[in-house]
Amino acid sequence: PPLNIALPRTANQHGAACLNYMPVTAIERTGGWIQSLTATDKETGESCRIRTRMIFNCTGVWTDSIRRMVDPDAPSIVRCSRGSHILLDRSFLPGDSGMLIPKTRDGRVLFCIPWHGMTIVGTTDVEQREPDWNPQATEEEISFLLETAAGYLAKPVSRADVKASFAGLRPLLRAPEGGSTAKASREHAVIPEFGNMITVAGGK
């Protein structure tokens, strides 16, 4: 099964109580220690208070949102980078092999891969200011992918050939010097903070 299903399933087998669709909505901290958090059931609207001894903040692009429930002035440590992909007909990449374009005009790599009877083309690297539960590929990104892949595909391609598009968000570590997300570190950091919270941030 996919990792996001296998992980809670394995945790449950080891005695964890896995609460899906129950986002944290508040965190209580007194005396330099996180005492509890409040989670709300998205299906019923009911909230519950959970007492805590230790919190692991492994929330990807929502890392800073959780940290600011503890301290509204906590500095940002994560940048959101959007990666978008398009799906084309299989005829644009006949055969069973994928293809890697080593350098695009923005200095990234681009890939074309056979995928479930289609051809997947990706990816972009665009900074997104705020996390989004349902990120979308922009027309600018779709045009970039088409223009970059056009010289390598088996036949001419146009916007009308795009069967679908999708996007995801990367939680990249924020560097003091800034710069483009394409050049941002793909490393991760493990940060003990707020007395009894461990934040795992970054990675890809």
Residue ranges and their predicted role:
Residues 2, 6, 10, 68-204:
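C-terminal catalytic lobe of FAD-dependent flavoproteins
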Residues 50-60, 149:
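Short hydrophobic core segments
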Residues 57-72:
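Flavin (primarily FAD) binding-site architecture
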Residues 1-54:
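Helical element adjacent to the flavin cofactor pocket in flavoenzyme catalytic cores
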Residues 45, 62-63, 94, 127:
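Glycine-rich nucleotide phosphate-binding loop and flanking beta-alpha elements
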Residues 25, 35, 64, 84, ...:
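Glycine-centered loop/turn positions within well-structured domains
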